[in-house]
Amino acid sequence: VLKKILIANRGEIAVRVIRACQEMGIATVAVYSDLDRDALHVRLADEAYALGGTTAAESYLNTELILDVIERSGADGVHPGYGFFSENTDFARAITERGVTFIGPPPGAIEIMGDKVSSRIAAQAAGVNGVPGTTEFLNDASEVIAFGKAHGWPVAIKAAYGGGGRGMRVVRSEDEAAEAFDSARSEALKGFGRDECYVERYLTWPRHIEMQIIGDTHGNCVWIAERDCSAQRRHQKLVEESPAPNFPPEIRQAMGEAAVTVARACGYFNAGTVEFLFQDGEFYFLEMNTRLQVEHPVTEMVSGIDLVAEQIRVASGLPLSFTQESIELSGHAIEIRINAEDPAQGKFLPSPGHITTLVPPAGFGTRWDGGYESGDTVSQYYDNLVGKLICWGSDRETAIRRTLRALREFRIEGISTTIPADLAILEHQDFVDGIHSTKWVEDTLDLSNVGSTATVADGESEAKVQRDVDVEVNGKRFSVKVFVPESQAGAVVAGGAAGGASRPRRSGGSGGAGAGGGSG
């Protein structure tokens, strides 16, 4: 089994991986930007190294900086989490070429499935059909018009290397094609660095159902359970649950087998998710996410399988600890994404800021996967996911009631969150009846009366400023930088840390010289 794992990520997923490593007796290495120097994942890790910078491009998406930390820390494995480099073929290859284990699928599988056009071709070649669409990149809007005339309107232009609804435009008539084509390409280029797009038929009332798979290097590949992620807004998932409501057992079996077929066709191992659209008793291949999903905890709750631990086992060369036949599912689980957004009147405006109070709910069947604690700050420069509330019940009705209770119990102050909108979703009869689709939140759910959770903080946390300080350690002089409250900037700061990494302090604070990144 791997001895030391670097987590090339931040927020709740970095915390999730660190905790799994701790339970397995594996040392952990965190990396952080200037804004994240006091972040929870930094405080929890055994070692932490500064990447510098403010934006993701300057830090978490800087390949050379991360490769340098891998070498300096002696990590023998890298977990990419989700987002950032998790589905980047070049990053995975750069890791493996250095003799370090990438905790994910092989680069070749990422390459095939990372491009939505090539993934459609691969799935179709394996006998798993997707929504009718093009298998080549679009050159201009005339091809969109031709496809719409052949298959009917509306159609959807999608970024080939995108996700989360970015780089996607729905075209309802020939007149909208040119503007939508240019807009989709522009957004794709800004969001993913590639502007290639394709077009496909746009289903009118589909459900988004995905299948969790995992394989090892010994030829084993299984499907665990499906997740229904139909409660979405602007193609961003809000609520996920497992098992999917009103989902026929024979369709579940067929979808699971199809997911494994797709995975085997591209030589896949480790954890992955095959996404489908389901409408009128038929399911269509959508894409494969070659990474751990945000919503993986609902599968863990109903299966009892620790997917992160299993990822590490597989990456270490061990076989899966279970077989397809040994998987037993129990009860129902629901995950709520708690984002720093103000849902007032259904607008979902970003709400970065200082969290003055964060007290997650507790109780039987209640789990909180968070990336922040009281006193932490949600930055405008990164994804605003504060954490995920996951509740389990013996059946769906119990799970819904438990989730509602937990949401009402949740205390978070200083920022606005999506909790009021989450309550509106779970209390709506359409959701209770399980008849919602991916269009339901935007087309049916009325959030105009939803209020804000913003609170007036008793006092904002004082800004910290950088100061260069000379310190002496064991008779050797070092120049280090420290971050201190502005009011104390003129004071003499004693203490420091030598070397590139320091043991983070669990209690927060700036950690003296800063965890990692010292010039010694």
List where the protein language model places each region.
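N-terminal beta-alpha lobe that positions the nucleotide/phosphoryl donor
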Residues: V1-V274, F278-E295
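Catalytic cores of soluble metabolic enzymes centered on carboxylation/carboxyl-transfer
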Residues: A259, P297-P504, S510
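Structured functional modules or segments
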Residues: G508-G520
